[in-house]
UniProtKB/Swiss-Prot annotation:
Keyword Plastid annotated: no
SUPFAM superfamilies attached to this UniProt entry: Alkaline phosphatase-like
Biological processes per GO annotation: defense response to virus
Family, as annotated: Belongs to the alkaline phosphatase superfamily.
Taxonomic source organism: Escherichia coli O9:H4 (strain HS)
Protein name, UniProt field: Alkaline phosphatase-like protein BrxZ
Keywords for this protein: Antiviral defense
Length: 865
């Protein structure tokens, strides 16, 4: 033993005791006594010393002094020990290798000396120090061996999961990088006699047994046990030989698998092992005919995720009218909280796409007979309240599906085709036919107005000006987003309403005809009259001033104490620069162009829905800047027009051919023609722009009925200009900044609350279920809550796997919002008299949310063969 360890051992004893007894029957250290120097310690060689005199000196003469009493023999029996009373309040020092090692480690159990001696080769300086960081005073042979294994494996703790994580990581590195660390670890375990200890530990804790135990075989049994517990219960027989043996072992193994998937540090290792096991086991072959609902908990391999998705796609295609919506939505939510969706965004997007597809199918089922409304006002109201959701669901489905396709996956191809046919061939066709019937019956081309619906051409007078009747309103901001469709604005409004200091309210207005940029932008400006000038093509003039371009619009607005600016220019300004710029103006018009700039170009129109997502983000940021940095309190987000978009390429049937080529054309577009003395056509709406937009001249228009186009130049799938509701139902999203007191009173969307469904929680199996209730449905006032759920003992040790659950049900029936959580206990050492707690932890912040007392009363399951 090195001298410093010897000295350190003595110093450690004197740090806690005044008197230390040192028995050295082999007299190994008799020659070193003379050189032994310990500060403030008196050494007494008891070979010839009078024990009575020493006792007097220690207790009476020098009661504060520290003494080291060295004996050349073993401690005498108590009845012959003159110093017994002193010995009982003192400490003993042992100077053999094992004793000094125990002393260095800070372990007082001298009964471990023989075990330390057997493991003597383990105790290099480096390993001893690493072991010292792990041990406690309460060690036995088993716990000490486990911590030695942890040191050799390179684990930071002696938890079984940490040891396994390190060994598995070394195994994966060996397989993928030809790394030799695992070989070194295994050789070291064998050299120190710890290899059989490792396998016995795994047998005791997980029920793992094998004739020739190995990491490969352990992994096989872990994955098979995981599959057997989570997958279709009717398809377990094929896994039976490789399932771990005991109930407590299986529960511990399942808890390990849950922890493995949850710990992103070991993601690469899990993905590699899962792929290897998937190739070896081919679980998809066994579960191909299983119901996806029987696989709802399973996340063992990626092929299981793919099997579930295939089944859900088939269900949507084959059971679209009989689908159990609640079960379907619940399964989607559950799957999105599982491993493969959390680690591979394209799988999360697949379930988002399925959710929107189901939403679209449900809307179709509710309107299977078409869209028959008695008049235009009723039709308009129906669109604003519900029918716009067809367009929204279609857009969102394609947004997610395109993300999936971009990764090279074709899993949604058949559903893609089905949704496209539903939307384009049924919804748009039915909607346009029924809407056209109402427009024709009411002769709306000659009277372009709908009872109770504001008109876009009156926007400034009816929306902007009245704001100043409130003396507290000093400035109004108007954000005009080119081609912002009503359904996109609705999504924007929902997002804004999640902000505590803002409130958004969506209304609609009837857009001008033809519904295109120049005319729509002009209609939104303050004006008395709009007109075209024959010498300037399709440029619209407001009271004799051109409305084309930001500088001209700024000129018009200056007459009304207003100004115009592009959104990009405004966002580039520093806060004070922005405030200085708008200081002298009451009305600020901000032009934003993302959707139209993308959709109205042939080379980029396929990115229209991507542009909608970008626009929502940009507009929300713009609103936030106006309120927080420019101190805006009244903001209106509106548009010049909406748009029609179909994902599929158009055919010749989508094109209208005019019988006579119009002369005197001012503007020729895919969805409209503006000119003078235009010919009538059976397939077109014909009218005067004076009737539909308040233009003062005699210009006319032709618009294809329904969704057809005149030509496909400049892109054909993205269009506007016509009479379809998607084109002329223009959003007016009013956003208010709330004062502090109002903001505090404003009902804020907050996470749903979760409570235990039963007052007493009792677990009687190593793998058992707990029912939890989501108190409110997700909706306007409540948002989803994601929890980590697990069990701890009274020392706050985690004794189960951590389950990640998303509570996001929007069902209004309480019983439908109950979720069962399967918990896997770690080990079998549970006592019904001990205290345990069910912990509900916020998954994002990892802070406690709720806790409930739990009784664990396991049946006797492991006592016999």
């Amino acid at each position: 033993m090195q001298n410093q360890d010897f000295i350190a051992g003595l110093k450690a004893k004197f740090a806690e005791h005044r008197i230390v007894f040192w028995h050295d029957p082999d007299k190994r250290f008799i020659e070193e006594l003379e050189q032994l120097k310990l500060e403030n310690v008196t050494l007494i060689n008891m070979t010839h010393a009078s024990q009575l005199a020493v006792k007097k000196r220690i207790e009476m003469d020098e009661p504060e002094q520290q003494f080291l009493l060295w004996f050349p023999h073993d401690a005498p029996p108590h009845e012959q020990d003159w110093l017994l009373d002193i010995r009982l309040y003192s400490s003993e020092f042992h100077a053999d290798f094992a004793a000094i090692t125990l002393n260095t480690l800070g372990i007082p159990q001298l009964g471990l000396r023989e075990h330390i001696q057997r493991r003597k080769a383990f105790f290099s300086t480096k390993r001893t120090q690493a072991l010292k960081n792990l041990v406690t005073e309460q060690e036995d042979e088993t716990s000490l061996d486990k911590k030695m294994i942890a040191v050799i494996a390179g684990a930071k703790t002696a938890k079984t999961e940490d040891i396994l994580f390190n060994l598995i990581t070394q195994y994966v590195n060996q397989q993928t990088e030809d790394d030799s660390e695992l070989e070194n670890t295994q050789a070291m375990l064998k050299r120190h006699g710890l290899d059989p200890v490792l396998w016995e530990m795994l047998n005791h804790e997980m029920g793992y047994q094998a004739e020739e135990p190995s990491l490969e075989n352990l992994l096989l049994k872990l994955f098979c046990t995981d599959l057997s517990a989570q997958a279709d219960r009717q398809q377990r027989a094929w896994l039976e030989k490789n399932v771990l043996l005991t109930p407590s072992g299986r529960a511990s193994a399942l808890a390990f698998m849950v922890t493995w998937r949850a710990d992103r540090r070991y993601k690469e290792a899990y993905d590699y092992c899962a792929q290897q096991m998937q190739a070896a086991l081919r679980p998809e072959d066994h579960y191909r005919l299983s119901s996806p609902y029987d696989l709802h908990e399973c996340e063992t391999t990626l092929s299981i995720e793919q099997t579930i998705i295939h089944a859900l796609v088939t269900q949507l295609l084959e059971e679209s009218t009989t689908l159990d919506r609640e079960a379907f939505k619940k399964l989607l939510s559950e799957r999105q909280s599982k491993y493969w969706c959390q680690t591979q965004p394209e799988y999360y997007a697949i379930y988002d796409a399925l959710r929107q597809a189901e939403r679209l199918l449900n809307l179709r089922n509710r309107h299977i007979d078409g869209f028959h409304y008695q008049d235009s006002a009723t039709f308009w109201k129906a669109y604003c309240e519900e029918l716009f959701r067809f367009d929204q669901a279609y857009r969102l489905f394609n947004e997610y599906a395109l993300l999936v396709h971009s990764k090279g996956a074709m899993i949604l191809k058949s559903l893609d085709d089905y949704i496209e046919a539903l939307y384009s061939n049924w919804y748009l066709a039915e909607l346009s036919r029924n809407w056209n019937e109402v427009l024709e019956a009411e002769n709306r081309m000659q009277a372009w107005q709908i009872p109770g619906v504001p008109r876009q051409k009156n926007f400034f007078n009816e929306v902007v000006k009245p704001q100043f009747q409130n003396p507290q309103i000093k400035r109004v901001f108007v954000i005009i987003s080119d081609a912002l469709r009503y359904e996109v604005a609705e999504e924007l409004g929902n997002q804004i309403n999640t902000e505590k200091r803002f409130t958004a309210e969506l209304r609609s207005q009837l857009g001008v005809l033809p519904s295109y940029t120049q005319l729509g932008m002009a209609a939104l400006l303050p004006h008395e009259q709009l007109c075209y000038q024959p010498s300037n093509g399709d440029i619209v003039y407001a009271d004799g001033l051109s409305t084309s371009g930001i500088p001209n619009r700024d000129t018009i607005l200056k007459n009304y104490k207003g100004m115009a600016i592009k959104s990009k220019d405004l966002l580039e300004l520093k806060n004070q620069e922005g405030r200085d710029l708008i200081r002298d103006y009451e009305v600020v018009y901000i032009w934003h162009n993302t959707i139209d700039a993308t959709g109205d170009t042939a080379s980029t129109e396929d990115k229209t829905f991507e542009a909608c997502r970008t626009a929502v983000t940009e507009l929300k940021d713009l609103v936030t800047k106006v309120i927080n940095r420019l101190h805006g309190t009244r903001i209106f987000v509106t548009a010049d027009h909406g748009f029609l978009f179909q994902q599929q390429a158009l055919s010749v049937q989508d094109k209208t051919t005019l019988q006579i080529k119009p002369e005197n054309t001012i503007k020729n577009h895919k969805r409209f023609i503006i000119g003078h003395q235009l010919p009538a056509d059976d397939f077109c709406w014909k009218g005067k722009v004076a009737d539909t937009a308040g233009v003062s001249d005699n210009s006319e228009f032709l618009i294809p009925k329904g969704i057809q186009r005149f030509h496909f130049s400049g892109g054909a799938r993205f269009v506007h200009g016509g009479t379809m509701l998607q084109e002329v139902c223009v959003p007016v999203l009013q956003i208010k900044a709330l004062q502090k007191t109002a903001a505090e009173k404003q009902p804020q969307r907050r996470p749903v609350d979760i409570v235990a469904y039963h007052p007493m929680i009792k677990l009687v199996n190593n793998i058992d279920k707990v029912s939890l209730l989501q108190t409110h449905p997700v909706g306007e006032l409540y948002e989803p809550r994601i929890l980590n759920i697990y069990i701890v003992d009274n020392a706050n040790n985690v004794v189960s796997g951590k389950e990640r659950i998303s509570f996001d049900s929007d069902n209004s029936t309480m019983e439908k919002r109950v979720r069962e959580v399967t918990l896997k206990l770690i080990g079998a050492n549970f006592n019904r008299r001990n205290e345990y707690w069910l912990i509900l932890e916020d998954a994002q912040t990892e802070t406690g949310y709720q806790k409930y007392p739990v009784i664990i009363d396991l049946a006797f399951q492991d006592d016999f063969f």
